[in-house]
Amino acid sequence: MSQESSVLSESQEQLANNPKIEDTSPPSANSRDNSKPVLPWDYKNKAIEIKSFSGYKVNFTGWIRRDVREERQRGSEFTASDVKGSDDKATRKKEPADEDPEVKQLEKEGEDGLDS
């Protein structure tokens, strides 16, 4: 019993040393508000399919920050326009007028050398 009473007295001392804050007064008008604005989030219904190590298919759906989503969209639009422009250049045929006159001259000299 004496041991139980000593444990109780120790816990009572700890409670006495840690008083609870019981301030019911409203916050003052000049107190600093350290809260930050809430970031807007968007729910994406699109699933990202990932194959797990165990062979199960996992679809991730969920929330994404609006600013991150908009940044990714701008980035994808930018890269899509770059890819489209580079494809046009790569698939375009070279016009004969675009050829260098020196290259044409060398080709003619090479053909003339083969004929003689």
UniProtKB/Swiss-Prot annotation:
Where does it reside? Nucleus
Residues of the region (Disordered) are 1-40, 70-116
Query: What cellular component GO annotations does this protein have?
Result: Ino80 complex; nucleus
Start-end of Low complexity biased regions? 1-15
Going by the UniProt record, its keywords in alphabetical order are:
Nucleus
Q: Where is the composition biased (Basic and acidic residues)?
A: 84-108
Q: Name one GO biological process term.
A: telomere maintenance via recombination
Look up the further comments and give them. Present with 538 molecules/cell in log phase SD medium.
Please describe the quaternary structure of this protein. Answer: Component of the chromatin-remodeling INO80 complex, at least composed of ARP4, ARP5, ARP8, RVB1, RVB2, TAF14, NHP10, IES1, IES3, IES4, IES6, ACT1, IES2, IES5 and INO80.
What name does this protein carry?
A: Ino eighty subunit 4
Organism, scientific name: Saccharomyces cerevisiae (strain ATCC 204508 / S288c)
As recorded in Swiss-Prot or TrEMBL, the protein's gene is named IES4
